[in-house]
Swiss-Prot record:
InterPro entries in the record: HAD-like_sf, HAD-SF_hydro_IIB, HAD_sf, OTSB-like, Trehalose_PPase
Role summary: Removes the phosphate from trehalose 6-phosphate to produce free trehalose.
Reactions mediated catalytically: alpha,alpha-trehalose 6-phosphate + H2O = alpha,alpha-trehalose + phosphate
EC primary class: hydrolase
Keyword terms, alphabetized: Hydrolase, Magnesium, Metal-binding
Gene: otsB
Pfam families assigned: Trehalose_PPase
Record organism: Salmonella typhimurium (strain SL1344)
Protein name: Trehalose-phosphate phosphatase
């Protein structure tokens, strides 16, 4: 059972930070295009990266192109599409590709099927596909059955469940493998990994971080193998503030003991 996260890592410690985006750094919206990461949060991430030799990466189901757009004007190491594409600290990209015929056939099948499922949405990511049903939860079972059919017919693909989404991605790619790859490279190598995420897609990352003796943090409710928990996206934002400004947080704790309003509720 994950414990509430009440102690922030010391800014001077030897950590490598990994953050999911949707539901972790940004509030989930009805449509992915509506999601925004507040500029202040991006500044905190950039500051945290600077204090850790650049050892901070975004790990997401989104494409790297989307992640860069959401992180502007900052540029971080990234793992997109659950690790199917990755960019290291030097800007070198590592991309898992599928045969063009497979991508074409799968996309055609998905598009033709979703026509009969109003309210659902297909997001094509090149080497992966996301079947969204946030606006049509009654079609969850149908999308799951469709994804299972696809992964059975094309064994190089695997199914990944998420919040109001069923994803089809290259087999063997997940956020845990992406984090493990970063941890083999400078500036991440030799550091203690910290991973913050909110979804089923983040569980593989929690497993890798736990095995490495790091800090795994689940955002929100639900069963998890993460060791720690933050209740909401605003709690993640406050936690980032605490990490970046530990002296300010100490003053907050002193004020709390003196009976003043606390900076934030216990997280």
């Amino acid at each position: 059972m994950a414990e509430p996260l009440t102690v922030s890592p010391e800014l001077t410690a030897n950590y490598a930070y990994f953050f999911d985006l949707d539901g972790t750094l940004a509030e989930i919206k009805p449509h992915p295009d509506q999601v925004v990461v507040p500029h202040k949060i991006l500044q905190l991430l950039d500051r945290l990266a600077a204090h850790n030799a650049g050892a901070l990466a975004l790990i997401s189901g989104r494409s790297m192109t989307e992640l860069d757009a959401l992180a502007k004007p900052f540029r971080f190491p990234l793992a997109g599409v659950h690790g199917a594409e990755r960019r290291d600290i030097n800007g070198k990209t590592h991309i898992v590709r599928l045969p063009e015929a497979v991508v074409r056939e799968v996309e055609a099948l998905l598009r033709s099927t979703l026509v009969a499922l109003p309210g659902t949405e297909l997001e094509s990511k090149g080497m992966a596909f996301a079947l969204h049903y946030r606006q049509a939860p009654e079609h969850e079972a149908a999308l799951l059955a469709l994804a299972q059919h696809v992964t059975q017919h094309w064994p190089q693909l695997a199914l990944q469940l998420g919040k109001c989404v069923v994803e089809i991605k290259p087999k063997g790619t997940n956020k845990g493998e992406a984090i493990a790859a970063f941890m083999q490279e400078a500036p991440f190598a030799g550091r203690i990994p910290v991973f913050v995420g909110d979804d089923l897609t983040d569980e593989a990352g929690f497993g890798v971080v736990n095995h490495a003796g790091g800090i795994s943090v689940k955002v929100g409710v639900g069963a998890t193998q993460a060791a720690w928990r933050l209740e909401s996206v605003p709690d993640v934002w406050r936690w980032l503030e605490q990490i970046n400004y530990p002296q300010q947080e100490q003053q907050v704790m002193n004020n709390r003991r003196d009976g003043y309003e606390s900076f934030s509720r216990s997280i």
